[in-house]
Swiss-Prot record:
It is found in: Nucleus. One of its GO terms (biological process) is compound eye development. The lineage of its organism: Eukaryota, Metazoa, Ecdysozoa, Arthropoda, Hexapoda. Residues 248-267 have a biased composition (Low complexity). InterPro entries: HD (IPR001356), HD_metazoa (IPR020479), Homeobox_CS (IPR017970), Homeodomain-like_sf (IPR009057). It comes from Drosophila melanogaster. One of its GO terms (cellular component) is nucleus. Coiled coil: none annotated. It holds the Pfam family Homeodomain. The gene is zen. It comes from the Eukaryota. The keyword Transcription regulation applies. Its main location: nucleus. Residues 48-92, 148-170, 202-223, 242-267 are annotated as: Disordered. This is Protein zerknuellt 1.
Length: 353
């Protein structure tokens, strides 16, 4: 009896070492016990500490077991290059088609870009190829065909975009020419003044009669040439330049031609081009009549070229304008076009000597 009583307290102490009561364990804790911190089945308290701290496992394990773990971890390291080498070996090499196979495939592609399976198998057997090789070749060939089509379409689209720009530049030039007729004539006076003037011959103190007669004939011919040249210059200036039209005329008293600047208007006016051309024609006719009636013989007799003075540099003389063209005047707007209007471009004037 005493022996039994002596054994019982030892048994009670062993049972008391468990911290949890089996009657209080829940069903969910039994299933998901490894996710909770609570010990569901009454394991020793040192069990959770061993799982949380892995270094304690090595302390309790034998040295032989630790050595086996290190060996197994070292054996796992060289296993990765083996997998990489296997992957490199599994990489498919590019198929090298022969010239005969390429010709047959190209002919088939021209006839039909898309193949159904029976036709693909037939071509593969005939060319000693796999069905997959024929399928991939047709896919690549279709992609190349689409790229070629897109490459041809891009230059056409660029050319279409360039055409409107050229048309716009042409329209701008037309608009500038039309706007030039309504601009202020004062803007063009500066350009007319910058034109080089004709040089006047120096006066010879000993006049020569033969030289004076020769100069008279040259002056008479120059008057006709200058008038026609001035008229063509005016028409060209109206059609091409963007500034207001200006007229240059020649004076017969000095035997040379000078430029005459037009009077500027007070503001911007828009006139009809035909009216402007008609006013130019009338002013030129009036100036031609005045030139024919002028007596330039006494003046020309006193002017001649001297042989010793040919090396001298001629001087430029700005003569006063011989006529006044009403470019911006309201009177030019009220003039009416005559029925028998002659084209000033082809009109020629013959002046008497």
């Amino acid at each position: 009896m005493s022996s039994v009583m002596h054994y019982y307290p030892v048994h009670q102490a062993k049972v008391g070492s468990y911290s949890a009561d089996p009657s209080e364990v829940k069903y969910s804790d039994l299933i998901y016990g490894h996710h909770h911190d609570v010990n569901p089945i009454g394991l020793p308290p040192n069990y959770n500490q061993m799982n949380s701290n892995p270094t304690t496992l090595n302390d309790h394990c034998s040295p032989q077991h630790v050595h086996q773990q290190h060996v197994s971890s070292d054996e796992n390291l060289p296993s990765q290059p083996n997998h990489d080498s296997q992957r490199v070996k599994l990489k498919r090499s590019r198929t090298a088609f022969t010239s005969v196979q390429l010709v047959e495939l190209e002919n088939e592609f021209k006839s039909n870009m898309y193949l159904y399976r029976t036709r693909r198998i037939e071509i593969a057997q005939r060319l000693s190829l796999c069905e997959r090789q024929v399928k991939i070749w047709f896919q690549n060939r279709r992609m190349k065909f689409k790229k070629d089509i897109q490459g041809h379409r891009e230059p056409k689209s660029n050319a279409k975009l360039a055409q409107p720009q050229a048309e716009q530049s042409a329209h701008r030039g037309i608009v500038k020419r039309l706007m030039s007729y309504s601009q202020d004539p004062r803007e063009g006076t500066a350009a007319a003044e910058k034109r080089p003037m004709m040089a006047v011959a120096p006066v010879n103190p000993k006049p020569d009669y033969q030289a004076s007669q020769k100069m008279k004939t040259e002056a008479s011919t120059n008057n006709g040439m200058c008038s026609s040249a001035d008229l063509s210059e005016i028409l060209e200036h109206l059609a091409q330049t963007t500034a207001a039209p200006q007229v240059s005329t020649a004076t017969s008293s000095t035997g040379t031609s000078t430029n005459s600047a037009s009077s500027s208007s007070s503001g911007h006016y828009s006139y009809n081009v035909d009216l402007v051309l008609q006013s130019i024609k009338q002013d030129l006719e009036a100036a031609a009549q005045a030139w024919s009636k002028s007596k330039s013989a006494p003046i020309l007799a006193t002017q001649s070229w001297h042989p010793s003075s040919q090396s001298q540099v001629p001087t430029s003389v700005h003569a006063a304008p011989s006529m006044n063209l009403s470019w911006g005047e309201p009177a030019a707007k009220s003039r009416k076009l005559s029925v028998n209007h002659m084209n000033p471009c082809v009109t020629s004037y013959n002046y008497p000597n």
